[in-house]
Amino acid sequence: MTTLADLRINYSRASLDEADVAPDPFAQFDRWFKEALAAKLPEPNTMTLATVGENGRPSARIVLIKGVDERGFVFFTNYESRKGRDLAAHPYAALLFYWIELERQVRIEGRIEKTSTDESDRYFASRPLGSRIGAWASEQSAVIDSRATLEAREKAVAERYGENPPRPPQWGGYRVVPDAIEFWQGRPSRLHDRLLYTRDAAAAPGWTISRLSP
């Protein structure tokens, strides 16, 4: 019988060398993300978002990345959800992309800021109608008595707003402004490659790269 202790993979697809990576972590992330897309991975834009609540307890969940540029990594959610309350109490977060088919991880840590009203409005308007209605119908993370209650709210919102529901005031974007980004490539015998970009205003282009022991 197979036990958990027997479950393992010996990674061997690729290596990660300092000479081969971009000096800027956003450029390196773009390179890896394009390779994930080219490999046709299922939802390569999924990431784990870790937060810490007012009581000091961590929590994590899967969310979708919706924008990346030199300012940071953007996702959208309900500001009154558990993650929203966590980020109001402690405006720092960690992200993790895990692309098992490529034997890669990207870890990101940084402070949180809300996106502008215009950014949130533009993205909300681009969502499918059902998702826009759902943003009104769901009081995310709140206890409800039944699925029927949620569906009744959905119907009421659809009847109220029709084809053009506005963005709810409690719904919008966050940007993780990173001060550290780690790229991890699986290697044989668990001797993985780990390159850490750390923000450094004195360095060009504003980041230093360090190799970490696996």
UniProtKB/Swiss-Prot annotation:
Binds 1 FMN per subunit. Its cofactor is FMN. Pathway: Cofactor metabolism; pyridoxal 5'-phosphate salvage; pyridoxal 5'-phosphate from pyridoxamine 5'-phosphate: step 1/1; Cofactor metabolism; pyridoxal 5'-phosphate salvage; pyridoxal 5'-phosphate from pyridoxine 5'-phosphate: step 1/1. It catalyses: pyridoxamine 5'-phosphate + O2 + H2O = pyridoxal 5'-phosphate + H2O2 + NH4(+); pyridoxine 5'-phosphate + O2 = pyridoxal 5'-phosphate + H2O2. The keyword Flavoprotein applies. FMN binds at residues 61-66, 76-77, 82-83, 105, 140-141, 184, 194. It comes from the Bacteria. Keywords: Flavoprotein, FMN, Oxidoreductase, Pyridoxine biosynthesis. Its EC number is 1.4.3.5. Catalyzes the oxidation of either pyridoxine 5'-phosphate (PNP) or pyridoxamine 5'-phosphate (PMP) into pyridoxal 5'-phosphate (PLP). HAMAP family: PdxH (MF_01629). PANTHER family: PYRIDOXINE-5'-PHOSPHATE OXIDASE (PTHR10851:SF0), PYRIDOXINE-5-PHOSPHATE OXIDASE (PTHR10851). Belongs to the pyridoxamine 5'-phosphate oxidase family. Homodimer. This is Pyridoxine/pyridoxamine 5'-phosphate oxidase.
